[in-house]
């Protein structure tokens, strides 16, 4: 019987991969392509409008076969089915994990504790659509009767990163007579700069907090309310300028928001998986209900692909499994996400939370320490071609092995002369350069002076994948996000970690709540931290002024 939750490194499937690595390790990508010139047309997969070329990864078809065998041995098909059925796969919190229900079509049945949640999802979507149409048309006015001109989303984590990324990604489809701003940091600078040039009478705040008690979000929301009331004077104005995305009606009412303007979601939606729930209200206002439905359709297409496609042709499974291969067997513990589209400039930051908060775990789902291997690769990146002039030097000639995901589109949203061909030429060139490099002989053949040959040599053999789609649309964005959501799930199953909790964020919160009282105390507090923290607190209190 397969061992689905035991130590990964002791499984026969893992040992088979280690034996395969010993055979493959000496082979450079140059040699792999020379031996098999057709791998660039075979080591590819398609789904939900996305094309994945993983032929420049340090894998062969045998590698993929062994990775699929590992996935089956670790129970990926069964765990995937359990998630789609609404079982409580978030084991540490005893919750279902059903972001897939947020994009399920009307009429589909998905049960949580015996209740079909799909009608509830569509009821919220319908309310969101009606409200978005009001704001977009000008039918929703502020307290003084002025039309809303700026929407400010106030949230943090998944309540900010997803909506902010989606707005920037879909600006080409956004309504142009509304401005959108996003406030997340408890640093007062974030809010102050966001509202500095706004007219309170024309500003609508969307406050996104499931409990309506999140420290950063509610601190910003309270300051935003004070800013509004300083200008408009009447507490009744709050009801026309604030909307809640929450499930805590009592706190929403206490804040001054009409519960009729509260949009809820469910405990089976994790924050970093929530951009297509009511958390995405700012996105719906920006691109309209129809654009949001297209976004959901892209999510759904990738959900169905992940659920139904064979693992060897399954995009999320391939990205997840090759990521495990790179991190745990090749030693590439970091992934550079490199979108060659300026609209996706916040996509790497979004993926940081999705991947690192999900799989950055040191214990298994059952609470035993992870044995002998890493989890949760470090994700980072910048849009191309900007990154080429900053950190690509390290990618090509540095001592760290960094796996790369290139993302590009065949059709530009703004066809300006040669711009798009130049952009895509750089994308293709970078993948080629990382894979094949430049030998010393090639450098000499170019006339490079001998003392410079070591500096002009590129080792190559740096793994990368390329994801191509025809055009960046709401639908392709949904598919792209769902691709990584399910890749994260795949890796969590292999590593046997709970990809849907985030206990690691708790300790800092508890300590901060204690320290803020010490910072605000009018009397000198009796500090009982370590020597460093005590000294820093005393220095801050002495020098903060005011």
From Swiss-Prot:
GO MF terms here are: carbohydrate derivative binding; glucose-6-phosphate isomerase activity; monosaccharide binding
Q: What class of enzyme is it?
A: isomerase
**To which pathway does this protein belong?**
Carbohydrate biosynthesis; gluconeogenesis; Carbohydrate degradation; glycolysis; D-glyceraldehyde 3-phosphate and glycerone phosphate from D-glucose: step 2/4
The subcellular localization recorded is:
Cytoplasm
Name the residues annotated as catalytic in the UniProt entry: 357 (proton donor), 389, 509
What cellular-component terms does GO give this entry? cytosol
Pfam families to which the protein is assigned, alphabetical: PGI (PF00342)
Key words of the record: Cytoplasm, Gluconeogenesis, Glycolysis, Isomerase
Which Gene3D superfamilies does this one have? 1.10.1390.10, Glucose-6-phosphate isomerase like protein, domain 1
- List its EC numbers: 5.3.1.9
Principal localisation: cytoplasm
Q: Which InterPro entries match?
A: G6P_Isomerase, G6P_Isomerase_C, Phosphoglucose_isomerase_CS, SIS_dom_sf, SIS_PGI_1, SIS_PGI_2
| Catalysed transformations (reactions) | alpha-D-glucose 6-phosphate = beta-D-fructose 6-phosphate
Disulphide bridges: none
Output one GO BP term: glycolytic process
Q: Which family does it belong to?
A: Belongs to the GPI family.
Instruction: State the function annotated in the UniProt record.
Output: Catalyzes the reversible isomerization of glucose-6-phosphate to fructose-6-phosphate.
Matches recorded under PANTHER family: GLUCOSE-6-PHOSPHATE ISOMERASE
Indicate what this protein is called per its UniProt record.
Answer: Glucose-6-phosphate isomerase
Native source species: Anaeromyxobacter dehalogenans (strain 2CP-1 / ATCC BAA-258)
């Amino acid at each position: 019987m397969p061992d689905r939750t035991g130590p990964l490194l002791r499984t026969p499937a893992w040992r088979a991969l280690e034996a395969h690595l010993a055979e493959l390790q000496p082979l450079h990508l140059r040699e792999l392509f020379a031996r098999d010139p057709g791998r660039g047309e075979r080591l590819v997969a398609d789904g939900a409008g996305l094309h994945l070329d993983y032929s420049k990864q340090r894998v062969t078809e045998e590698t993929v076969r062994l990775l699929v065998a590992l996935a089956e041995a670790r129970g990926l098909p069964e765990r995937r089915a359990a998630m789609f059925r609404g079982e409580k796969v978030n084991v540490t919190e005893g919750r279902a994990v059903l972001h897939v229900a947020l994009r399920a079509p009307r009429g589909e049945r998905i049960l949580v504790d015996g209740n079909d949640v799909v009608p509830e999802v569509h009821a919220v979507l319908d309310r969101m659509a009606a409200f978005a149409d009001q704001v977009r048309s000008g039918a929703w006015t502020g307290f003084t009767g002025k039309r809303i001109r700026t929407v400010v989303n106030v949230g943090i984590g998944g309540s900010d990163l997803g909506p902010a990324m989606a707005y920037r990604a879909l600006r080409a489809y956004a309504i142009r007579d509304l401005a959108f701003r996003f406030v997340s940091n408890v640093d007062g600078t974030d809010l102050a700069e966001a509202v500095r040039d706004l007219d309170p009478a024309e500003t609508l705040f969307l406050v996104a907090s499931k409990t309506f008690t999140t420290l950063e979000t509610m601190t910003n929301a309270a300051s935003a309310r004070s800013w509004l009331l300083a200008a408009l004077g009447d507490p009744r104005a709050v009801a026309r300028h604030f909307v809640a995305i929450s499930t805590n009606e009592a706190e929403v009412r206490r804040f001054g928001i009409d519960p009729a303007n509260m949009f809820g979601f469910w405990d089976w939606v994790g924050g970093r998986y929530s951009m297509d729930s009511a958390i995405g209200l700012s996105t719906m206002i920006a691109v309209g209900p129809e654009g949001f439905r297209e976004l959901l359709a892209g999510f759904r297409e990738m959900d169905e692909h992940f659920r139904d496609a064979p693992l060897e042709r399954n995009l999320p499974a391939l990205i997840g499994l090759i990521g495990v291969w790179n991190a745990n067997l090749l030693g590439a513990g970091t992934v550079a996400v490199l979108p060659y589209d300026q609209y996706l400039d916040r996509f790497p930051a979004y993926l940081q939370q999705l991947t690192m908060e999900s799989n950055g775990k040191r214990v298994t789902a059952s609470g035993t320490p992870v044995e002998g291997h890493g989890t949760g690769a470090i994700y980072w990146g910048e849009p191309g071609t900007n990154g080429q002039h900053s950190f690509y030097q390290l990618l090509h000639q540095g001592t760290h092995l960094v796996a790369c995901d290139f993302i590009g589109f065949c059709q530009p949203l703004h066809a300006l002369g040669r711009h798009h061909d130049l952009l895509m030429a750089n994308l293709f060139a970078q993948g080629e350069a990382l894979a094949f490099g430049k030998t010393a002989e090639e450098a000499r053949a170019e006339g490079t002076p001998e003392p410079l040959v070591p500096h002009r040599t590129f080792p190559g053999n740096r793994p990368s994948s390329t994801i191509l789609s025809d055009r960046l649309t709401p639908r392709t964005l949904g598919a792209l996000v769902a691709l990584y959501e399910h890749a994260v799930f795949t890796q969590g199953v292999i590593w046997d970690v709970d990809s849907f909790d985030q206990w690691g964020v708790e300790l800092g919160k508890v300590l901060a709540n204690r320290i803020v009282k010490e910072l605000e105390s009018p009397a000198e507090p009796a500090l009982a931290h370590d020597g460093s923290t005590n000294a820093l607190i005393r220095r801050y209190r002495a020098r903060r002024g005011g």
